[in-house]
Regions:
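Asp-box/WD-like beta-propeller blade repeats and closely related beta-sheet repeat scaffolds
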Residues: 129-180, 195-207
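Conserved blade-ending motifs and adjacent loop-strand segments that build the rim/top face
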Residues: 249-271, 325-359
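Bacterial Sec-dependent N-terminal signal peptides
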Residues: 1-32, 93, 124, 407
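Short beta-strand elements that form the blades of beta-propeller/WD-repeat-like
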Residues: 76-82, 123-129, 166-177, 218-238, ...
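Blade/loop signatures of beta-propeller domains
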Residues: 20-56
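Structural signature of eukaryotic scaffold interfaces centered on beta-propeller domains
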Residues: 67-73, 114-121, 159-166, 209-224, ...
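Beta-strand-rich domains and repeat architectures in extracellular enzymes and scaffolds
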Residues: 38, 50-85
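Blade-loop segments of beta-propeller domains
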Residues: 57-63, 67, 95-122, 130, ...
Length: 407
């Protein structure tokens, strides 16, 4: 009898050990588990180095207001899209290379430019215009046009963004009471390869309560040539494989902090509910995301008011980083007022948060020249940072911040 009991205990223990040794699902982003554990995160924890690269300023290349932070870095070139839809290109060292503005109604021009994307192999620029995508070389030469509205099915949808992946295009569509599709994969002839539907249960809520639209818009981002799709408040981030099939790339666990789309008070500024907002960026090791956290924040961020209005306001969003290799999720505290992101502990610069992540593993953002100079005057910075500031004029072009991320 004693032997039987001993065997039973060993069997139970073995089962428990095996259960505890189950491999961790590295797709799971435990947002709920990150609440109450926010901390300052140093840039050196996720990066190898940082560079500040002033963009050359001359009569041909005066960078105006950048259109919704549309900045890219691929193939050794920086691309900035201005508010007037001019695309200004500088090389790896910040030297002016070219300026492209093909605004017009000709067959090789764009009548509008809603956004752009960069071909990761050639460095060519593709522009999303009305009903078509036009591609130009770095020199500004016309390469080709893809009239996606030639596809009768696509002509019924309003395209807001796109990602060019090799010879394919993923088009992000708005959702409304006439269309439940959040995106389409097409080839270079506008042939439809794949449609991505907005989740049915969420779609019904969005079309019933139009006020939710701005929160529940679908989002796309990329990791190299992989297209990622996030449908509103849905917990899944999808990815499109090379064979045009769809897989789950990541799964959010919002737990008790998941908002109910049918309860409007869940979306008030200080509501204690979490949802993914703004744009996500991804490198080989990290996923960078911003979430509404409302009153859940350990230390709410403070930002300066704009438009000549003095004072501060509570910024009810928190930056975060997810380590794809360890499965660790971390909310990031604000380093100081009016700054968001990682503590810049290499040269003493301001906090760093991506506006782009390149296919070769660089986090990219930028600073206006007058802001760069002001930071050098009010903070303890390295000799290198101060030297760059001393050689800038307030009216110079922006300074690119290029961070080499760890792999």
């Amino acid at each position: 009898m004693k032997k039987l009991i001993l065997i039973f205990i060993i069997a139970i223990t073995s089962c428990q050990n095996n259960s505890g040794n189950q491999p961790k699902d590295l797709r799971l982003i435990d947002v709920e588990g990150g609440v109450g554990k926010s901390r300052l995160v140093k840039l050196s924890e996720i990066a190898e180095s940082i560079e500040y690269i002033p963009l050359e300023t001359n009569s041909e290349a005066v960078v105006g207001k950048i259109f919704f932070d549309r900045i890219f870095y691929e193939k050794g070139f920086f691309y900035l899209m201005e508010q007037n839809r001019t695309i200004i290109i500088h090389d790896n060292d910040g030297k002016y290379f070219n300026k492209i503005n093909k605004l017009g109604r000709g067959p090789q021009e764009y009548d509008a430019a809603f956004t752009v994307d960069i071909d990761l192999k050639t460095g060519n620029i593709s522009v999303l215009a009305s009903n078509k995508i036009i591609e130009y070389s770095l020199d500004g030469d016309f390469k080709k046009v893809m009239n996606y509205k030639d596809n009768g099915f696509l002509s019924k949808h309003y395209i807001t963004r796109f990602i060019k992946s090799d010879l394919k295009y993923f088009l992000l569509s708005t959702i409304n009471d006439r269309s439940q599709h959040s995106g389409f994969l097409i080839d270079s002839t506008a042939r439809l390869l794949l449609s991505v539907e907005y989740p049915g249960e969420d779609y019904e809520k969005v079309t019933t309560y139009s006020a939710l639209l701005s929160i529940m818009y679908p989002m796309i981002f990329r990791h190299k040539n992989a297209v990622r799709i996030k449908n509103g408040l849905n917990k899944y981030i999808l990815t499109i494989n090379e064979d045009n099939s769809i897989d789950t790339a990541y799964i959010f666990n919002f737990g008790k902090y998941a908002p109910d789309p049918l309860k409007r008070d869940h979306f008030r500024t200080h509501a204690p509910f979490i949802w993914n907002k703004f744009w996500n960026f991804e490198s080989d090791q990290y996923l960078f995301m911003t979430f509404h956290t409302g009153s859940l924040s350990d230390k709410p961020a403070k930002m300066f008011r704009k438009g000549g209005v003095e004072g501060e306001y509570d910024y009810n969003f928190e930056c975060s980083v997810f380590n794809k290799k360890t499965g660790e999720f971390q909310f990031i505290l604000q380093p100081e007022i009016n700054q968001l992101g990682f503590v810049e502990d290499f040269e003493g610069g301001p906090a760093v948060w991506p506006k782009y992540v390149s296919s070769d593993g660089y986090m990219i953002t930028y600073m206006d020249a007058h802001e760069f100079k002001a930071h050098a005057e009010t903070h303890e910075v390295s000799d290198k940072f101060k030297s760059i500031a001393d050689n800038l004029k307030d009216t110079d072009n922006p300074v690119i911040v290029r961070v080499k991320l760890k792999n």
